């Protein structure tokens, strides 16, 4: 009996152990399968650079999908007469099977050449792989082409982009070395003394490391009292280069010790505009911005608020109603801060906490805060290049939700695009709004998209929208646009993105409407009577507005402005003020007689937190967040949010930009500055920034500082229709046909348009009410003018030419050869 009892006892014990083991295993397995929170994946893509005789330049980051060639212009790589390039690849942990390249026309429509390189040289001491490519196809001089480099890696294809251009005597290697050397010399006060000859320094009473220029004191350019060292060495990126000048951008990281010995990190961007001479390189322009990486482990909580450090004063931030949680962005990262508890959360950040490199720390993205609730839950949008994570190597728009209680970020939807960050940023600058039903609204390429986040679907609410006749409210919750086609053409449509309600305003007979903007959530539009849109003799149209209305979404007219005897022209709408001219009709144009404005009388909402600047001895000008009340604690609690794995939720939009043709891009100071529909205004703007202008096909329209000292065209090479001297643009375009595109340069100076002659393009210039000449040459003292009536070419003094063309209104017309 005792034996049976002992057996039963042992059996029960083993059974209990077995059941508990099974239950424990099931529990662990269940935890493993249901805990879908994790850290963001590390970057995997290799980097690609161009090796100029041992000097590296033009670092390229990989894309996981082919991009539209005409919407990626991160760097320009000059080709010499051999048309050979050495490509350097930093593989990191990836295995590279082969390299291939493809050369396309700058608009991306035609493949010029493509080849594959099977073997890469790994003998270099730096651990990089190298391949030499030789472009055998004939490339036009001074014309950009797109170069796509493809790597076949262990994780699939990766794509890299630069622009190549054949230029003579560009001195590329010297320019690149100068930029690297300049940045390094700034780290040593003694070495920095040798830079004084390159600068135009002036006295200054303050030090601001976010806005350093060639006029800044040498002490500021050499980092004042900060005493930093370079912690991540940059690789120069060529932004523009020609026979006379080059523009170089250099991004690097510096490290400095604070008052307590703690480490501070700063992202630095230097911009150099250089000219090569027989004796030395001249520094034509220099700009630097340094921005501190936020680190709450350092002393950042003070009685005066939260110290953000060295950065731009325009802080993207959002607080909930009682101010218990504030979200803010800094250097590509999103943080929340609770002043009552001292709690910081690193909500979203590509930058790794340790063992990072430029792949995770580069900032080719931006963050827009969409909403925050009383609990601290946060909705936000990340758009641009994704450094790491699920969508590493993609450019696009991601919508995210941060759950404060669970400390987890959930990706709601991702919208990939095939254009680089600077183009995407320009597109999203018009509209991006998410309503409470999780619907995202974007305006891209003339289409108004509604993306249904929960279903990963989208609808097109309207298309063929003229961006010049589209406006959004201060919150982006309302929009208005003039309908351009169909039965409702000419009507103005209003939409409330929260309710999706719409309504239309129809102009009365003999009137047309112009969308001017918004004041708060109220639309502003102008009424133009028939016959008051005047086209002058130079082909420029100006709307003479009779009345301006400010109207609520329900149709209530909040204000109407009208001045008897005057027309309203040149309207600009700001956040607090609308300004305009009061003009009189004079023949086929308007003459400004007075100015007026309308103030925004709505009181600004009280802010629970504001950004303020102060000055320090060591860091110079710094920025802090000031709160209504002193923070309760100066002891920080720092958390890092986890990413929730929800699977891939992507929406692919049918964005087609091929129909957009009359767009001109101004590049300056190392990036895309702005877009224009008027080439003359684009040139004037680029001139003020010492930049360049490219058209939709990425052809050079105008370059500052790249003009031959003298040149005369062979008149037989000038198209016959241009030699006619007509300033009727329609007639000129018809005469050029598919071979070229007319560009109206009216308003530019003679000095501006002589660039076109240097680029082998004649310019029609108006000289009187019914007369014109064709500029076909110039030298230091004269222009060379072709008489359309006789075909004779004769010199005319430069000063006399300037006066002649100015008296006629500076009416200039030229053309661009279409790519073949």
Task: Label the model's feature ranges.
Residues 350-355, 415-421, 457, 463-469, ...:
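Short coil/turn segments at the loop-to-beta-strand junctions that recur within blades
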Residues 19-33, 70-86, 97-119, 124-126, ...:
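Surface-exposed, charged secondary-structure patches
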Residues 1-19:
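N-terminal Sec-pathway targeting helices
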Residues 29-49:
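Ser/Thr/Pro/Gly-rich low-complexity linker/stalk segments immediately outside membranes or between
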């Amino acid at each position: 009996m005792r034996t049976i009892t002992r057996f039963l006892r042992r059996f029960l014990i083993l059974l209990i152990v077995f059941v508990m083991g099974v239950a424990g295993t099931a529990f662990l397995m269940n935890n493993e399968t249901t805990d879908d929170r994790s850290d963001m994946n590390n970057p995997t893509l290799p980097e690609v650079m161009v090796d100029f005789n041992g000097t590296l330049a033009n670092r390229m980051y990989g894309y996981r999908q082919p991009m539209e060639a005409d919407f990626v212009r991160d760097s320009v790589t000059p080709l010499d007469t051999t048309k050979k390039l050495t490509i350097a690849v930093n593989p990191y942990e990836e295995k590279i099977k082969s390299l291939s390249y493809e050369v396309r026309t700058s608009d991306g429509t035609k493949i010029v050449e493509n080849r594959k390189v099977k073997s890469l040289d790994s003998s270099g001491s730096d651990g990089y792989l190298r391949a030499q490519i030789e472009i055998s196809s004939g490339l036009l001089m001074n014309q950009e082409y797109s170069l796509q480099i493809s790597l076949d890696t262990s994780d699939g294809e990766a794509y890299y982009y630069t622009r190549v251009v054949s230029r003579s005597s560009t001195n590329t290697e010297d320019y690149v070395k100068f930029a690297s050397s300049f940045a390094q010399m700034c780290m040593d006060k003694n070495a920095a003394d040798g830079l004084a000859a390159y600068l135009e320094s002036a006295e200054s009473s303050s030090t601001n490391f976010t806005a350093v220029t060639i006029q800044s004191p040498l002490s500021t350019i050499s980092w004042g009292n900060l005493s930093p060292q370079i912690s991540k060495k940059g690789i120069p990126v060529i932004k523009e280069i020609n026979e006379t000048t080059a523009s170089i951008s250099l991004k690097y990281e510096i490290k400095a010790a604070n008052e307590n010995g703690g480490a501070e990190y700063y992202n630095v961007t230097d911009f150099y505009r250089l000219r090569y001479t027989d004796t030395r390189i001249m520094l034509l322009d220099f700009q630097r911005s340094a921005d501190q990486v936020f680190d709450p482990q350092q002393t950042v909580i003070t009685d005066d608020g939260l110290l953000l450090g060295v950065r731009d004063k325009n802080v993207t931030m959002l607080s909930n109603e009682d101010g218990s949680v504030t979200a803010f962005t800094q250097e590509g990262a999103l943080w929340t801060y609770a002043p009552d508890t001292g709690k910081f959360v690193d909500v979203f950040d590509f930058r790794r906490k340790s063992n990072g490199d430029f792949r995770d720390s580069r900032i080719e993205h931006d963050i827009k805060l969409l909403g925050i609730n009383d609990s601290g839950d946060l909705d936000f949008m990340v758009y641009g290049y994704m450094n790491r994570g699920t969508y590493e190597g993609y450019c696009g728009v991601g919508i995210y939700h941060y759950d404060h209680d669970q400390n987890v970020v959930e990706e709601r939807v991702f919208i990939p695009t095939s254009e680089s960050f600077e183009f995407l940023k320009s597109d999203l600058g018009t509209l991006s709004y998410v309503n409470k039903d999780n619907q995202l609204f974007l305006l891209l390429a003339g289409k108004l998209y509604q993306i249904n986040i929960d279903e990963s679907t989208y609808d097109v609410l309207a298309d063929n929208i003229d961006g010049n006749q589209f406006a959004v409210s201060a919150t982006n919750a309302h929009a208005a646009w003039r309908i351009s086609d169909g039965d409702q053409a000419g009507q103005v449509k209003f939409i409330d993105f929260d309710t999706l309600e719409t309504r239309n305003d129809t102009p009365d007979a003999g009137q047309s409407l112009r969308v001017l903007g918004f004041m708060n959530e109220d639309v502003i539009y102008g009424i133009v009577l028939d016959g008051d849109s005047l086209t002058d003799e130079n082909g420029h149209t100006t709307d003479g507005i009779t009345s301006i209305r400010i109207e609520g979404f329900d149709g209530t007219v909040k204000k109407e402005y009208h001045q008897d005897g005057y027309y309203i022209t040149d309207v600009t709408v700001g956040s607090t003020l609308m300004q305009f001219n009061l003009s009189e009709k004079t023949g086929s144009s308007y003459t400004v007689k007075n100015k007026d404005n309308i103030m925004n009388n709505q009181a600004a909402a009280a802010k629970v937190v504001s950004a303020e600047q102060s000055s320090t001895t060591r860091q110079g000008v710094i920025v802090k967040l000031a709160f209504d009340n002193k923070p309760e604690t100066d002891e920080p609690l720092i958390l890092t949010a986890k990413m929730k794995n929800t699977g891939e939720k992507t929406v692919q939009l049918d964005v087609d930009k091929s129909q957009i043709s009359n767009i001109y891009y101004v590049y300056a100071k190392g990036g895309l500055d702005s877009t224009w529909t008027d080439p003359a205004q684009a040139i004037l703007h680029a001139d003020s920034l010492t930049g360049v202008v490219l058209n939709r096909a990425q052809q050079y329209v105008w370059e500052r500082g790249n003009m031959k000292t003298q040149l005369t065209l062979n008149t037989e090479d000038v198209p016959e229709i241009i030699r006619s001297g007509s300033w009727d643009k329609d007639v000129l375009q018809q005469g050029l046909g598919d071979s070229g595109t007319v560009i109206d340069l009216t308003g530019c100076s003679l000095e501006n348009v002589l660039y076109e002659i240097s680029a082998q393009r004649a310019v029609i210039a108006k000289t009187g009410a019914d007369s014109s000449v064709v500029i076909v040459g110039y030298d230091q003292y004269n222009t060379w003018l072709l008489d359309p009536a006789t075909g004779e070419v004769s010199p005319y003094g430069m000063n006399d030419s300037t006066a002649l063309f100015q008296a006629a209104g500076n009416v200039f017309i030229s053309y661009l050869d279409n790519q073949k």
